[in-house]
Amino acid sequence: MKKDIHPAYQQIDVHCVCGNKFKTGSTNKEIRVEVCSDCHPFYTGKQKSVEKGGRVEKFKKKFGM
């Protein structure tokens, strides 16, 4: 096997938009995520809608149904 061809694996910080930070291992220098275990509805028990509306809702709105 060739030496020194693999990227360096290191401890990095992961930043969520909710403000949570945690460490993990990666070849990247930093990772930013939109949803983590502190703000995901499954883990928090709070349901929030991330869907703005599908095709059916747009059709009903357009034709007044």
Swiss-Prot record:
Family: Belongs to the bacterial ribosomal protein bL31 family. Type A subfamily.
Cofactor: Zn(2+)
This protein's name: Large ribosomal subunit protein bL31
GO biological process terms, semicolon-separated: translation
GO molecular function: metal ion binding; rRNA binding; structural constituent of ribosome
Co-factor: note: Binds 1 zinc ion per subunit.
PROSITE patterns: RIBOSOMAL_L31
